[in-house]
Each structure stands twice: as structure tokens, then as C-alpha cells.
């Protein structure tokens, strides 16, 4: 029985190493931007998520072999569960207007670190948007807001059945 455990550990360790070896780490400047966004999460009361991002995640700037195989053409970031490898794409640095929007992306990825699926992550982030200070009034015209609203609507349509038109955000 112990040998089975040893084989499983060896396979998982090899898989993790292969994800790291086939991708590049973030630069020091990119890491600084990531840490600033994680501080926003801490400040908004997402200490569990921020702690996981600080202590568990291995941030990468290029796709590993698995992400190249699967593809993430519209993503700002991608998480490899259960390994904690988070690929941060150039769009993460290009399109979010500030650290609050980058924190929103990292909050989403933190749910994947815990094994949650895309539908759950989108749902939880949309519920938490006010807590982050990510509001329609301030961010409603940003690319990230529009993308996230579109993706959340596609995965969780019942969150957008309010208002006179029956298609408005029920949290607004």
C-alpha cells in the first residue's frame, strides 16, 4: 500500500515540475503588480483567498504544456488545479484599469486554487464585486467588467433576471 502512495506522489511531483519547467516565471515587476492586487483582496476581507495566492500559487508568465494543449484564448489568467500553477497572461497587465480589477481576476483564480469550477468562480466574484469596490458606477465601461458580466451571464443567467427588462443584474 505504501508503494502506491509513493507512485502517486512521484507522478504528481513530476506533473507539477513539468508545468513549471515548460513555462516562465513572472518578472519581479509583474510579481509586484500581483502582490499589490493580493493586498487589495486582503483589505477587502478575502484573507483566505489572498493567503492561498501568496503561499500556494506559482505565478507564471507563459503557458505550460498543458495550457498550450487546452488553450485559453480569452483568459486574463489560468489556474492548473490541483497544482496551484497560475499563468498570468499579458491581458492581465494590459486591460484592467487598476489594482482593484486585477484583484478581481485573482479572486476568480483563487477559487480555482481551491478546486472550484468556472461557474462557481464567476458566481462568487460577481457576488463579491461590491465588497471589492468593483462597481458598475466606477467600472461599468471597462473591458474587464464587460467580459466578466458576459461570462457570468452565460454561466449564471438567473443572476440577471431583474429590472424592468428582466435582464438586469439582480445585485444592482
Residue locations for each model-derived region?
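Active-site scaffold of zinc-dependent metalloenzymes
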Residues: 68-103, 110
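Structural motif marking the loop-to-transmembrane transition
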Residues: 1-2, 99
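Metalloprotease/metallohydrolase-associated module, dominated by Zn2+-dependent proteases
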Residues: 2-46, 50, 60-82, 116-172
Amino acid at each position: 500500500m505504501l508503494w502506491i502512495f509513493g507512485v502517486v506522489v512521484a507522478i504528481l511531483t513530476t506533473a507539477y515540475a513539468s508545468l513549471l519547467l515548460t513555462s516562465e516565471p513572472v518578472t519581479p515587476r509583474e510579481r509586484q503588480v500581483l502582490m499589490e492586487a493580493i493586498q487589495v483582496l486582503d483589505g477587502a476581507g478575502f484573507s483566505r483567498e489572498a493567503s492561498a495566492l501568496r503561499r500556494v500559487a506559482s505565478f507564471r508568465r507563459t503557458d505550460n504544456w498543458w495550457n498550450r494543449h487546452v488553450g485559453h484564448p480569452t483568459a486574463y489568467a489560468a489556474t492548473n488545479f490541483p497544482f496551484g500553477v497560475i499563468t498570468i497572461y499579458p491581458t492581465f497587465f494590459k486591460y484592467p484599469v487598476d489594482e482593484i480589477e486585477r484583484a478581481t481576476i485573482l479572486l476568480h483564480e483563487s477559487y480555482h486554487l481551491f478546486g472550484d469550477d468556472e461557474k462557481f468562480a464567476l458566481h462568487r466574484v460577481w457576488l463579491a464585486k461590491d465588497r471589492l469596490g468593483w462597481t458598475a458606477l466606477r467600472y461599468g465601461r471597462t473591458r474587464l467588467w464587460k467580459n466578466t458580466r458576459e461570462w457570468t451571464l452565460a454561466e449564471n443567467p438567473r443572476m440577471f433576471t431583474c429590472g424592468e427588462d428582466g435582464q438586469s443584474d439582480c445585485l444592482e
